[in-house]
Curated annotation (Swiss-Prot):
Organism: Rhodopseudomonas palustris (strain TIE-1)
Family stated for the protein in its record: Belongs to the HrcA family.
Pfam family membership, one: HrcA
Protein name stated in the entry: Heat-inducible transcription repressor HrcA
Keywords: Repressor, Stress response, Transcription, Transcription regulation
Function: Negative regulator of class I heat shock genes (grpE-dnaK-dnaJ and groELS operons). Prevents heat-shock induction of these operons.
An example molecular function term from Gene Ontology annotations: DNA binding
GO biological process, one term: negative regulation of DNA-templated transcription
Highest taxon in the source lineage: Bacteria
Length: 362
């Protein structure tokens, strides 16, 4: 603790939870000013904003104590103060009053997503949810959905070259996925047709994971039913469904351009460039979002709490959504600067996740 405390604003041996009301008010004003402007705020401005009459000198003393506690810091370019990541976390956890969506906002989100959900695929509805969320929060919106939970309807093989074919997977909800398959040498078109017929008779209504297990078992039992080349096509098709790390997950991002708004300096531009680079590292984003699938409700990662975006100084607010059986099947949320309007964004993410769950019957 700082040695000066002439008016007793901070109790002796104070931890973060023991800040008294005056200290909390000064700290709250520093954070709220940062969230609104992105700029450091000085003691003179703080003394005008707080409800208790304190001189700028007295405010500076309290700010020095807050700085020693690790809640605020002085950027080298300014005499004012900004909140640290620890300070932002303390603000979000202990001081922030989470707002609520207005009834028109709720109705607008629900009506727009429900209309898309009735007329289009789940993927289209999720994309619309992200577009809406990105527009409301002025941040980038992301969704991670489990492709493994999609139930299959139809498969088709289309030859591209003598040893390459396109595998077209059609899901019951209308999603279509294409994958390029390497064919064994000498496979005739008849083998592609036979393989498609064999698979279509057995995969309908199954998830990718269920279909893989079923077909791997059947291929061992029923080798005599299929010629050798058709067996190879089916085996190659099954292998293509397995994919690599994260291939059973689909990542959708909307609203990159929002991150370019309100840049204050070259440092901000570099931060956004790093964030764009991070968003392109899909494996890392998938890992991050996957951490929220076991959570109940909204999760918030601020700055270096999230290793993926630590260099870009970004925050992530995410929430899981469920299917008709109540199983968590994906995560959605927003990624933006650490000065996100947390009180407004948190209920937006939470409500959007609830509406998506309702659309899926969850």
């Amino acid at each position: 603790m700082a040695q000066h405390d002439p008016i007793g604003l901070i109790a002796p041996n104070a931890g973060l939870a023991q800040l008294n009301e005056r200290s909390r008010e000064i700290f709250r004003q520093i954070v709220e000013s940062y969230l609104a402007t992105g700029e450091p705020v000085g003691s003179r401005n703080i003394s005008r904003l707080i409800s208790v009459p304190l001189s700028p000198a007295s405010v500076r003393n309290v700010m020095a104590d807050l700085e020693q506690l690790g809640l605020i810091y002085a950027p080298h370019t300014s005499a004012g103060r900004l909140p640290t990541e620890l300070g932002l976390r303390f603000f979000v956890d202990a001081l922030m009053q989470i707002g609520d969506l207005t009834e028109p906002e709720r109705q607008s989100i629900q009506a727009q997503l429900s209309s898309v959900g009735r007329a289009h695929t789940v993927e289209a509805a999720l994309g619309e949810a992200l577009t809406r969320l990105s527009g409301l929060t002025r941040a980038a919106a992301v969704v991670l959905t489990a492709k493994a939970n999609v139930r299959l309807k139809h498969i088709e093989f289309v030859r591209l070259e003598p040893e390459r074919a396109l595998v077209i997977l059609v899901a019951e909800d209308g999603q279509v996925e294409n994958r390029v398959l390497t064919l064994p040498p000498g496979v005739p078109s008849s083998a592609l047709i036979e393989a498609a017929n064999y698979l279509n008779a057995r995969i309908r209504g199954r998830t990718l994971a269920e279909a893989r297990l079923e077909l791997e078992s059947l291929m061992v039992q029923n080798k005599a039913e299929l010629d050798q080349l058709t067996q190879k096509v089916i085996a190659a098709g099954i292998a293509s469904w397995s994919g690599g790390d994260g291939e059973d997950r689909q990542l959708i991002v909307r609203g990159h351009a929002n991150l370019l708004e309100d840049l204050h300096a070259l440092d901000d531009l570099e931060r956004v460039r790093l964030l764009f680079d991070d968003l392109e590292t899909k494996r890392g984003v998938i890992d991050l979002l996957g951490r929220a699938e076991s959570a109940d409700g909204v999760r918030i990662f601020i700055g270096s709490e999230n290793k993926l975006f630590s260099l870009s100084g970004s925050s992530t607010i995410i929430a899981p959504y469920s299917d008709g059986a109540g199983h968590i099947v994906g995560v959605l949320g927003v990624i933006g600067p650490t000065r996100l309007n947390y009180a407004r964004v948190i209920p937006m993410v939470d409500y959007t996740a609830r509406i998506v769950s309702r659309m899926l019957g969850g």
